[in-house]
């Protein structure tokens, strides 16, 4: 789960693609 907390908040090594926060 790369998106946690705020909307569109990408953080963490697992989140390589920003698309996951679309």
UniProtKB/Swiss-Prot annotation:
One of its GO terms (cellular component) is extracellular region. Keywords: Amidation, Disulfide bond, Ion channel impairing toxin, Neurotoxin, Secreted, Toxin, Voltage-gated sodium channel impairing toxin. The modification Alanine amide is found at residue 22. Negative results: does not inhibit rNav1.3/SCN3A, rNav1.5/SCN5A, rNav1.7/SCN9A and rNav1.8/SCN10A. The keyword Ribosomal protein does not apply. GO terms for molecular function: sodium channel regulator activity; toxin activity. The keyword Disulfide bond applies. This is Mu-conotoxin SxIIIA. It is found in: Secreted. Expressed by the venom duct. Belongs to the conotoxin M superfamily. The lineage of its organism: Eukaryota, Metazoa, Spiralia, Lophotrochozoa, Mollusca. Mu-conotoxins block voltage-gated sodium channels (Nav). This synthetic toxin potently blocks rNav1.4/SCN4A (IC(50)= 7 nM). It also moderately blocks rNav1.1/SCN1A (IC(50)=370 nM), rNav1.2/SCN2A (IC(50)=1 uM), and mNav1.6/SCN6A (IC(50)=570 nM). It is noteworthy that coexpression of subunits beta-2 or beta-4 (but not beta-1 or beta-3) decrease by more that 10-fold the binding potency of the toxin to rNav1.6. It is also noteworthy that the toxin is 50-fold more potent on mouse Nav1.6 than on rat Nav1.6. Its main location: secreted. Disulfide bonds join 2-15, 3-20, 10-21. The cysteine framework is III (CC-C-C-CC).
């Amino acid at each position: 789960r790369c998106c946690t907390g705020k909307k569109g908040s990408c953080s963490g090594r697992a989140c390589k693609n920003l698309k996951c926060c679309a």
